[in-house]
């Protein structure tokens, strides 16, 4: 549990960010903190304490407490704390540096990419100006050391002078994952060839030529990715190709409205039957959980596109594209289901545990969403919609889907935060830093017997996009970051039994055992002496 005492009062977002910062620190130290209560005291001269900008500081403080190490009190840090220990940007940077100087501090740690940042000043007419400043000028003005730190690892090093968590080995991809994803890619790319053959007699005009060229281009990318061994990327490209080929095939069939409705009915039945099969699967590992998430999401998405088909019957071209997409989404779901029942470290995945994980993740998103909306009130409507879907899943008891959608929504917000105030020519650096963190997380998860298939899949896809589309790569690296360490929300079914013993003070345990042995020995001696006295007494008689 987390207890927070503040003066003055604090807003909810600070309470949430404190809880999340604690979780990140516990994960960073690889310690199960579920048996400990954490008490934090925050005092300030401001009218109210708000925002998540103390997240990095709280994580450093919590880390030092857990590891029982001293840190340099002449150092200060500001920044949000995000999945994987990534330190995110904050507002009011100039004022914070000035405050650190007044307090006599020697070093200030700030988020990466803020060499030039902006201050937001609000006026009565809700107009704002962007006042830029150069941190090099502040360094000279105050003679204070200002250092950019991208991760919690780097911040801890600046506070302690020690490195505690570095990537030990290169990432080893699970052979089960590799074999299964390879088979998934083969299935989807083989379907591309099959669908392509269906349109051999296609009448080509300007419109269909564009569709055909796109389908062929995606299919070619799928084959190239497969030959390079990046099977998730291959499967993704072939899925896109399949949608285009299927759409072209449907166009040339000239289906009547009744025939379209009949196809919709058949597909709905197919979804229902397959969904029942999936519900019977037992979720034991992170791989199972993420497989279940992605399969259910695809089935739900297919169902939604079938709704769109029925709503757009008067627009033949639109409803046929939606029909093609729904069909391919179902096929994709069936392919992903092959990841269910993979081996790995087992966790306690009862409904209550997953519900709590979902609620925690929703709280994390809300905290960040409120913060970002202070600067971009109109630009996150899609994320808000995704979050609303997650809340609906929570209400309906679909906790796995809720966790999945909330994780993706959080990645959306974190992606905006990660480039907020970052110059365009620094985006590649931010992306590489995120990918590096994801890779390290994946290495550590693998060492723990966990292989997050979605985390790795998105990591692979982000790498394939980083040169051609760095902003999309940032988003997918965010998905990878969120979905590569879901285990921090769950307890290992085996670990609980081990921790039960580990939580006992070993010295007290040894003393207890020694006491029991001495007690038994004393009883034996007493009993022996008693018998001896009895024999002497009888001889005297």
Where are these regions (language model features)?
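Long, low-complexity or tandemly repetitive, helically biased scaffold regions used
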Residues: 250, 258-363, 367-370, 374, ...
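Peripheral, non-AAA+ core regions of ATP-driven protein-machinery
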Residues: 1-223, 252, 268-296, 300-303, ...
């Amino acid at each position: 549990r987390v207890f927070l005492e503040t003066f003055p009062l604090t807003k909810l977002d600070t309470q949430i960010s404190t809880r999340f910062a604690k979780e990140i620190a516990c994960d960073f130290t690889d310690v199960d903190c579920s048996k400990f209560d954490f008490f934090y005291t925050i005092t300030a001269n401001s009218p109210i304490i708000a925002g998540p900008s103390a997240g990095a500081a709280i994580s450093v403080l919590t880390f030092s407490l857990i590891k029982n190490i001293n840190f340099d009190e002449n150092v200060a840090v500001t920044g949000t704390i995000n999945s994987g220990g990534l330190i995110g940007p904050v507002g009011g940077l100039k004022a914070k540096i000035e405050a650190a100087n007044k307090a006599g501090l020697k070093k200030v740690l700030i988020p990466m990419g803020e060499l030039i940042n902006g201050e937001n000043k609000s006026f009565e007419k809700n107009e704002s100006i962007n006042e830029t400043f150069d941190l090099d000028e502040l360094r000279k003005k105050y003679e204070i050391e200002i250092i950019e730190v991208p991760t919690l690892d780097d911040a801890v090093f600046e506070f302690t002078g020690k490195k505690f968590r570095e990537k030990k080995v290169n990432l080893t991809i699970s052979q089960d994952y590799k074999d299964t994803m390879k088979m998934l890619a083969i299935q989807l790319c083989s379907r591309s060839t099959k669908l392509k053959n269906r349109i051999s007699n296609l009448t080509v005009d300007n419109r269909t030529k564009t569709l055909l060229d796109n389908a062929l281009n995606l299919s070619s990318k799928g084959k190239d990715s497969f030959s390079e061994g990046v099977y998730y990327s291959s499967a993704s490209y072939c899925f896109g190709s399949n949608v285009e080929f299927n759409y072209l095939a449907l166009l040339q069939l000239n289906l009547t409205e009744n025939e379209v409705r009949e196809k919709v009915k058949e597909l709905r039945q197919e979804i229902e039957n397959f969904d029942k099969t999936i519900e019977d699967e037992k979720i034991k590992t992170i791989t199972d959980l993420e497989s279940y998430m992605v399969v259910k999401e695809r089935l739900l998405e297919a169902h939604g596109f079938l709704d769109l088909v029925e709503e757009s019957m008067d627009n033949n071209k639109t409803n046929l594209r939606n029909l093609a997409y729904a069909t391919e989404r179902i096929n994709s779901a069936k392919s992903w289901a092959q990841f269910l029942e993979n081996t790995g470290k087992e966790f306690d995945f009862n409904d209550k545990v997953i519900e709590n994980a979902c609620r925690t993740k929703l709280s994390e998103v809300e905290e960040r969403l409120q913060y970002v909306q202070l600067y971009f009130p109109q630009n996150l409507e899609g994320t808000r919609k995704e979050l609303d879907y997650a809340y609906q899943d929570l209400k309906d008891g679909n906790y796995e889907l809720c966790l999945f959608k909330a994780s993706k929504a959080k990645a959306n917000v974190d992606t905006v935060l990660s480039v907020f105030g970052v110059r365009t020519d620094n985006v590649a650096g931010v992306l590489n830093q995120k990918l590096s963190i994801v890779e390290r997380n994946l290495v550590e998860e693998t060492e723990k017997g966990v292989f997050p298939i979605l985390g790795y899949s998105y990591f692979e896809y982000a790498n394939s996009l980083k040169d051609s589309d760095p902003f999309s790569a940032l988003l997918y690296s965010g998905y990878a970051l969120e979905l590569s360490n879901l285990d921090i929300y769950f307890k290992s079914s085996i670990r609980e039994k081990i921790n039960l013993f580990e939580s006992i003070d070993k010295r007290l345990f040894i003393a207890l055992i020694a006491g029991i042995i001495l007690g038994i020995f004393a009883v034996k001696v007493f009993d022996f002496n008693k018998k001896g006295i009895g024999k002497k007494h009888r001889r005297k008689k």
